[in-house]
Curated annotation (Swiss-Prot):
The modification 3-methylthioaspartic acid is found at residue 89. One of its GO terms (biological process) is translation. InterPro entries: NA-bd_OB-fold (IPR012340), Ribosomal_uS12 (IPR006032), Ribosomal_uS12_bac (IPR005679). With S4 and S5 plays an important role in translational accuracy. Part of the 30S ribosomal subunit. Contacts proteins S8 and S17. May interact with IF1 in the 30S initiation complex. This is Small ribosomal subunit protein uS12. One of its GO terms (cellular component) is small ribosomal subunit. It comes from the Bacteria. CDD domains: Ribosomal_S12. Keywords: Methylation, Ribonucleoprotein, Ribosomal protein, RNA-binding, rRNA-binding, tRNA-binding. Belongs to the universal ribosomal protein uS12 family. It holds the Pfam family Ribosom_S12_S23.
Length: 123
């Protein structure tokens, strides 16, 4: 524990703020090309096959991104738009792919929360 005098001489330095989405370089979204589309399994209490894609961004960075919703049409060389937002039970997945934008189709037969999944209003 420092003395008051030591703190006056050299005050405490604030902890540096760590960027949670470095690949976006301060932008809300970024465009990229899928280099690999695959499934992976989540951390311990959960069990599933989560759909993820490795994306090479326009910044030149490769990021692992989650594909939300049921079913998707992504394959290698698909052009996608990604946003920040991690997946809690997938380590290393810090980005989400936006549905219904560029080469990604919206989720079929989606009735609620449609805007998040790029689904049109049902007739």
């Amino acid at each position: 524990m420092p003395t008051i005098n030591q703190l006056i001489r050299k005050p405490r330095s604030p902890k540096p703020v760590r960027n949670k989405v470095p690949a976006l370089k301060g932008c809300p979204q970024r465009r990229g090309v899928c280099t690999r589309v695959y499934t992976t399994t989540p951390k311990k209490p959960n069990s599933a096959l989560r759909k993820v894609a490795k994306v090479r961004l326009t910044t030149g960075i490769e990021a692992v991104c989650y594909i939300p919703g049921e079913g998707h049409n992504l394959q290698e060389h698909s052009v996608v738009l990604i946003r920040g937002g991690r997946v809690k039970d997938l380590p290393g997945v810090r980005y989400h792919i936006l549905r219904g934008v560029l080469d990604t189709q919206g989720v079929k037969d989606r009735k609620q929360r449609r805007s998040l999944y790029g689904a049109k209003r049902p007739k």
